[in-house]
Design a protein with these regions (language model features):
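Secondary-structure transition motif
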Residues: 1-150
Length: 150
């Protein structure tokens, strides 16, 4: 069974955390309307109460920036690091001139699944194990702009 994990950047200190992703509705305040909090939690318990499911216990939660949330692909890079959506991976394995020394952004498409995209080519998940994570689009966007590594 595939491990379902998400990763996001904490609002409090810009630290990356991974775990379960929950969008929690904050209480309604008159005149303010409904608001939502995006959280990553390390443990999640769902209880069934009056035919409604709700989150009963969340021991440790982290508020995260929803723009930074990405899902774990279920795969690891050449160094054994977990590959998440929006990671930047460098392929430099003498595979072919179309992908060697290229930086790929890991993306997800609902119909196609996970894939890596560069400015000139794509890679499929079966190639991920030959790549190395060098950053992500939030912390190291300059790698993506370069497109290739020297």
């Amino acid at each position: 069974m595939r491990e379902i994990l998400f990763r996001g950047k904490r609002i409090a200190n810009d630290e990356w955390v991974s775990g379960y992703y929950v969008v929690r509705k904050r209480p309604y305040f008159k005149g303010k309307g409904a608001d939502f909090e995006h959280i990553i939690c390390d443990n999640l318990v769902i209880d069934d109460f009056n035919d409604r499911q709700f989150v009963d216990t969340i021991p440790i939660t982290y508020s995260v920036d929803p723009e930074t949330v990405g899902q774990y692909t279920g795969l690891t890079d050449v160094n054994g690091n977990k590959i998440f959506e929006r990671d930047l991976c460098l392929c430099d394995r003498n595979i072919s001139k179309h992908i060697d020394k290229k930086v790929f952004e890991i993306k997800f498409d609902p119909e196609a699944g996970f894939f890596g995209e560069s400015d000139t080519s794509n890679i499929c998940p079966s190639d991920f194990y030959m790549c190395e994570i060098i950053g992500n689009i939030f912390d190291t966007p300059e790698f993506l702009k370069a497109g290739e590594m020297p």
